[in-house]
Each structure stands twice: as structure tokens, then as C-alpha cells.
A protein has these predicted regions:
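Non-catalytic pre-domain segments flanking phosphatase-related domains
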Residues: 41-86, 101, 107-120
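A metal-dependent, Asp-based hydrolase signature
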Residues: 95-189, 194
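C-terminal cap/substrate-recognition subdomain and adjoining C-terminal extension
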Residues: 47-54, 58-64, 68, 158, ...
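Asp-based phosphoryl-transfer active-site loop
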Residues: 80-94, 295
Length: 350
């Protein structure tokens, strides 16, 4: 199980979760409860085995009870949509988001090649390795001040303008498979949270369609979403640039343009979720102020719903911070959302 092998590849962890559900296909009524879905599939849930990387407590019980109400209550499988933020919810986002590391390395290369960029942000921060500047920009953004975000965004858009979608995917995929987290000492693909990976498998085993709804780049996450999370690439919702198509002898080429299509954060999250799924999710999980509209949108008068807010409070195993989540934590208390404490609710982190 994921909780017993922190060094085990996450793809194997997710597969182990799914096998644990299949292993429950037996007849002992005390160990297992059979749930019939309104489809040709039947799933069995062994309550003693599920969410093994979660400690027994209010958060784990809330998840299991929500799934039980959804399935036993006959909510059609096609309505079982769950959405998850990525940075800080599914994988580690400190000391900086993983995609930020990817982009800063490219900006550093650009500043090396063109000295004129070294005095301009964000190339200046990348060249001087002033990652504190980036942290300040992100903190300002979550506090509602996007003045410096526009400066950062201009650099982000310039970093990969003009390259094909295939080339961008190859670069991001290679980065994620080779780069390591600066303080945790593990590869970035091993920075996904084992309890959340297990939760994704648990939901899928009970007929849910899981989606990523992230402020991070859609095309940055797509190459690894299936392998790491078991989420197909067509279920990845995220920020995006605009594209340009050019006809050629090789079937045509789509390239990134140096302009944003949309930033999938704040109010854009529910808009993009609706645009992609045509539904209000039954479950949403986030960790920051930018996730509040998505969590608000996951509300139903006549169906079960669950809002999860991941709280980073474990300096020993991960990080301890609330910056950028102050409003979300306040709303969680006011609205009865389920707070998931990394320190108290997770038996394992990675």
C-alpha cells in the first residue's frame, strides 16, 4: 500500500490502491459491503482497507461517508465528478511551484544568452536566483494584488513562445523526470501526496470521474497526469496560452503564442470546470484562496457534496504555512468545509 512504501513509485502506489479494491471482491459480509452502481459495473468497498495512508479521524470519515451516501443514494455515475487543484493539493508547491522551477530555468537560459534581460524582471530574479521575489509575487497574488503577477506572466509567456506543442511537452516531460525538489531531495514525480493519490483511486473505484482544475499550466501537467494521478490528459484543466496553427508538409504545426488564453484561478476555475464538464462537481479539493470559487461551486441542494481544504501544518514531513490560504481557512470554518491536516490526517505524505 502507498503508506508502507514512501520510496515506491507513485504509479505503483496508485495501482496498489486499485488492486486493494479488487481484492475485496469476496463474500464475507462483515468485511465488505457491496455497492451497486447505476451502470453495468459493481464495486466493493472494504472500509478497513481504504485510505490506508490516512489516519482515522474526521477527515477520513467525511470522505468515506460522502462516497457511501453518493453510491448508496443512487447518484448516477455520470454525475460523479470530482475536481482537484494541483499545486499544494495533489503535489508539493513549496518552496516554489514545480512549474515555476521549470520556467525559471528557461528564463535563466534566456538571460545568459541576452545580457540585456538581466536587469528586467522576471529574468533578473531567475538570473540572480532570487526565488524570494517569486514567492513575494505569489503571496501578493493570493492577497488580491496582481501588479507583479503581470510582470511575471510576461516573462512566462515569452519563455516558450514560438515552440510547438510537441516540443513543449517533450521539454516539460524531461524536466519532470529528471529534476529534483530543492529541499526534499526527491524527484518531482515523487512529490505527489500519497494520501491524495489513494483518494483519487478510491473515488475512481466508486464510479467518479476525477479532473485536475489547476492554476498551473494545462500543457505542463498533461504528460504525467495519467502516470502520477491516474487522471487522463483530457481531464486536465489549467491555465493556457493561445496557439497558432501553421499548415506544412508534416500535418501542420501548433505553436505557443506569447499571450495568455486564460489563468485558471479564482473565478475562472468554476467557469472552466463547467465549460469542460457541464456539471457542478460533487467533490472539490483545494488549498488556497484561489480555490474558494471552485469550492463554493461544489454545492448541491439535493445531492451529497464534499469540500476538502488541505492544510499545510507539518514542518517535519513537508512544510508549515498558511500564506495564501488565510481567506480559504476562514471560509472553511464558516461554511463547514472539511479541513485536511497534513500533520494529523495523513499517516504518510509521499
Amino acid at each position: 500500500m502507498p503508506g508502507s512504501g514512501c520510496g515506491e513509485p507513485l504509479a505503483q502506489q496508485l495501482w496498489s490502491v486499485r488492486l486493494s479494491h479488487l481484492a475485496c471482491l469476496r463474500t464475507e459480509p462483515l468485511a465488505c459491503e457491496l455497492w451497486r452502481l447505476p451502470s453495468s459495473f459493481r464495486y466493493v468497498e472494504c472500509v478497513t482497507n481504504v485510505l490506508a495512508t490516512w489516519n482515522e479521524g474526521a477527515a477520513r470519515r467525511a470522505v468515506i461517508e460522502f462516497v457511501e451516501r453518493t453510491v448508496s443514494g443512487g447518484v448516477p455515475a455520470e454525475e460523479r465528478v470530482a475536481v482537484f487543484d494541483n499545486d499544494g493539493t495533489l503535489w508539493c508547491e513549496k518552496p516554489m511551484p514545480i512549474q515555476a522551477d521549470f520556467i525559471l530555468r528557461r528564463l535563466y537560459e534566456m538571460a545568459q544568452a541576452d545580457p540585456g534581460l538581466r536587469g528586467r524582471q522576471p529574468w533578473k530574479a531567475a538570473y540572480e536566483r532570487d526565488y524570494g521575489w517569486l514567492g513575494t509575487v505569489l503571496a501578493e497574488h493570493y492577497a488580491g494584488n496582481d501588479t507583479n503577477v503581470r510582470t511575471l506572466l510576461a516573462g512566462v509567456l515569452a519563455a516558450y513562445a514560438g515552440i510547438s506543442v510537441e516540443e513543449f511537452e517533450a521539454k516539460s516531460d524531461a524536466f519532470l523526470r529528471t529534476a529534483k525538489h530543492p529541499t526534499l531531495g526527491r524527484g518531482y514525480l515523487q512529490c505527489a501526496y500519497a494520501p491524495m493519490v489513494e483518494l483519487l483511486g478510491y473515488l475512481e473505484a466508486n464510479g467518479f470521474a476525477n479532473y485536475i482544475a489547476s492554476g498551473g499550466g494545462r500543457d505542463f501537467m498533461r504528460p504525467i497526469s495519467q502516470e502520477v494521478y491516474g487522471i487522463p490528459r483530457d481531464r486536465v484543466i489549467g491555465s493556457a496560452t493561445t496557439f497558432q496553427y501553421t499548415s506544412d508538409d508534416h500535418g501542420g504545426t501548433i505553436t505557443h503564442k506569447a499571450e495568455a488564453d486564460y489563468l485558471d484561478d479564482g473565478p475562472q476555475k468554476p467557469i472552466r470546470i463547467w465549460s469542460r464538464t457541464g456539471r457542478r462537481p460533487l467533490l472539490a479539493a483545494g488549498n488556497s484562496n484561489g480555490d474558494i470559487p471552485m469550492l463554493d461551486f461544489t454545492q448541491h441542494p439535493d445531492k451529497p457534496s464534499l469540500r476538502l481544504l488541505v492544510l499545510h501544518d507539518d514542518s517535519q514531513r513537508e512544510f508549515d504555512y498558511t500564506s495564501g490560504a488565510e481567506q480559504a481557512l476562514e471560509r472553511a470554518g464558516q461554511s463547514g468545509w472539511t479541513i485536511v491536516s497534513i500533520k494529523n490526517d495523513w499517516a504518510a505524505v509521499f
